[in-house]
């Protein structure tokens, strides 16, 4: 149930009846303060200006045409021409009832789209580090939300599995006579990469062999392809352990590495030349873009093929967008890549659009994100100044959570304690990131993320168990409760009900903008409203059974909404804490 959409349409029709143009925007928003009702229509200002009348006068005319019978109990004009809408308690009660009767909590499914989501993108022969965390978990929250809404989501893990370094790695593998690479673990591979690089830099004969191997690998030689595949397999097996620990839905089947697009690259360069978009410049093949200017104010040249015939990341990204539209039939493509890549992507996509590879009707969206910083405000590093491995970070999260929950539950059985520590520790790391606006940098702080108060995973997980405990104490018959009516008489009941019914609106924003922090803020607010409701509206000691059952149903919908909302974020819930 999307109340905002329902009210927007009603207000729009009333505005048109009052003389506004057909494309008028009612600007219906959730009210920021209780005294302004549940929703506010702010569109009178802009439209009144166009019509040459006072906004308040337009608002008065709109009200004569606005029929919110059975939806609103009161509609009033505030200030210069805002329309405040107060929802009818009977309307709220009816829709709470409907939400409880539905597995989807009353959330409608929009028109189904095929949506490709590009996220995570680790590199082969390197261990995942904290720099991969944001893309992986923000992208996965977007994927879960879009799938819940009924879209066909294609996860695209754009793994760095190609490039000149593979000649070096294969040459080193051969030199060490470690053809049985399947038994190597990635921890060895990290050292293996360093040793290979050292030899490459210091031993010219080795470097020459490595360069030859790149050519052989790129020409499709089966022996070198087999060695390359071993390196990819070891890496992805290790990465899968990290994905599973993070409760992320990526699997090996979602890998669409850079190498996938190699066969397309010569054809794309030839096509861009044929279309007059690419030209020869100093031996390289370049596309000049008027939209981007260099320091001299001239169109910027984007190289798509080097003098030596090699291709660049831009060429791969052009092929990648083309493939996602032509082969995967995407209606929309989302890229969870950090903000430093923005200009690079914009240039690749400008070429994609000019060449007609992806029509304007298919959005290519860069859902960029900021950096993860330490308490000193600098990029998050180990004490020695090195890159923090993701596995080490998760180990520490688990260890800290283990101490925290053991302190609070000294008598809990060990296996249950371990499960709880895992849910709290991993949940804390993920939620700390997801609850921040992705476009900004954020400070990584163990104490804040593991706190039981504030907008944190432990607080949200605890809020969920608290609602469940009400049910355990009530010893309620589920069937009897299902048949009981919902009655809303108190203000706090109405506020909680209205917020519960805004779940679909929240999902819609996350799906449209790729902003999981909006869901975190909604759930945190919901938990706070439930707390106030629980304090002021007795449930178990309510004045009669009818009121008790009605309040239990509000509690029931709160628990279901918290669980489902946290699930769209990839945060585990527990029954007891």
Swiss-Prot record:
Catalytic activity from the UniProt record: tRNA(Arg) + L-arginine + ATP = L-arginyl-tRNA(Arg) + AMP + diphosphate
Record-listed E.C. numbers: 6.1.1.19
GO BP terms: arginyl-tRNA aminoacylation
Pfam families tied to this protein: Arg_tRNA_synt_N (PF03485), DALR_1 (PF05746), tRNA-synt_1d (PF00750)
One example GO MF annotation: ATP binding
InterPro entries tied to this protein: aa-tRNA-synth_I_CS, Arg-tRNA-ligase, Arg-tRNA-synth_N, Arg-tRNA-synth_N_sf, ArgRS_core, DALR_anticod-bd, Rossmann-like_a/b/a_fold, tRNAsynth_Ia_anticodon-bd
Enzyme category, top tier: ligase
UniProt motif 'HIGH' region: location: 122-132
GO cellular component: cytoplasm
Chief subcellular location: cytoplasm
Keyword annotations: Aminoacyl-tRNA synthetase, ATP-binding, Cytoplasm, Ligase, Nucleotide-binding, Protein biosynthesis
Entry's localization field: Cytoplasm
Subunit structure: Monomer.
Alphabetized NCBIfam families for the sequence: argS
Family: Belongs to the class-I aminoacyl-tRNA synthetase family.
Protein name: Arginine--tRNA ligase
Organism of this sequence: Escherichia coli (strain SMS-3-5 / SECEC)
């Amino acid at each position: 149930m999307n109340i905002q959409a329902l009210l927007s349409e009603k207000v729009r029709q009333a505005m048109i009846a009052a003389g506004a143009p057909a494309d008028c925007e009612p600007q219906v928003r959730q009210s920021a303060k209780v005294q302004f009702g549940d929703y506010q229509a702010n569109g009178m200002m802009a439209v009144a200006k166009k019509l040459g009348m006072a906004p308040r006068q337009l608002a008065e005319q709109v009200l004569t045409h606005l029929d919110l019978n059975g939806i609103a109990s009161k509609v009033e004009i505030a200030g210069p021409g805002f329309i405040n809408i107060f929802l009818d308690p009977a309307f709220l009660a009816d829709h709470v009832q409907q939400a409880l009767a539905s597995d989807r909590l009353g959330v409608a499914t929009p028109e189904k789209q095929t949506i490709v989501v590009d996220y995570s993108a680790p590199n082969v022969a390197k261990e995942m580090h904290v720099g991969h965390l944001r893309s992986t978990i923000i992208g996965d929250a977007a994927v879960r939300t879009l799938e819940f809404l009924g879209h066909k989501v294609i996860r695209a893990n754009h793994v760095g599995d190609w490039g000149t370094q593979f000649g070096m790695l294969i040459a080193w593998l051969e030199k060490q006579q470690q053809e049985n690479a399947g038994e190597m673990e990635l921890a060895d591979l990290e050292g293996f990469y360093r040793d290979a690089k050292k030899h490459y830099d210091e031993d010219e004969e080795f470097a020459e062999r490595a360069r030859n191997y790149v050519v052989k690998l790129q020409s499709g030689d089966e022996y070198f392809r087999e060695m390359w595949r071993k390196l990819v397999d070891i890496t992805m097996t290790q990465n899968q352990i990290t994905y599973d620990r993070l409760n992320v839905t990526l699997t090996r089947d979602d890998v669409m590495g850079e190498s996938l697009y190699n066969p397309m690259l010569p054809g794309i360069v030839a096509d861009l030349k044929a279309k007059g978009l690419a030209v020869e410049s100093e031996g390289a093949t370049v596309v000049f873009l008027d939209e981007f200017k260099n320091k001299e104010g001239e169109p910027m040249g984007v190289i798509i093929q080097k003098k030596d015939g090699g291709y660049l990341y831009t060429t791969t990204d052009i092929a990648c967008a083309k493939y996602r539209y032509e082969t995967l039939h995407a209606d929309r493509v989302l890229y969870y890549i950090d903000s430093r890549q923005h200009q690079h992507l914009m240039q690749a996509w400008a070429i994609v659009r000019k060449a007609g590879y992806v029509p304007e009707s298919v959005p290519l969206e860069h859902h960029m994100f900021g950096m993860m910083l330490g308490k000193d405000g600098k990029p998050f590093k180990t004490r020695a100044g090195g890159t923090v491995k993701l596995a080490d970070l998760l180990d520490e999260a688990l260890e800290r959570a283990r101490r925290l929950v053991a302190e609070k539950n000294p008598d809990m059985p060990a296996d249950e304690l371990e499960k709880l520590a895992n849910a709290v520790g991993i949940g804390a790391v993920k939620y700390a990131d997801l609850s921040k606006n992705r476009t900004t940098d954020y400070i990584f702080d163990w104490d804040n993320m593991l706190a039981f108060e504030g907008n944190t995973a432990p607080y949200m997980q605890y809020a969920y168990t608290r609602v469940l405990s009400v049910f355990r104490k009530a010893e309620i018959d589920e069937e009897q409760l299902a048949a009981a009516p919902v009655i809303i008489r108190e203000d706090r009941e109405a506020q909680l009900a209205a917020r519960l019914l805004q779940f679909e609106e929240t999902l819609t924003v996350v799906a449209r903008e790729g902003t999981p922090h909006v869901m975190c803020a909604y759930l945190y607010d919901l938990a706070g409203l439930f707390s106030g409701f629980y304090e002021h509206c007795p449930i178990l000691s309510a004045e009669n059974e009818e009121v008790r059952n009605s309040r239990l149903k509000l509690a029931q919908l709160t628990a279901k909404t918290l669980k489902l909302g946290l699930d769209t974020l990839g945060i585990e819930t527990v029954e007891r804490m």
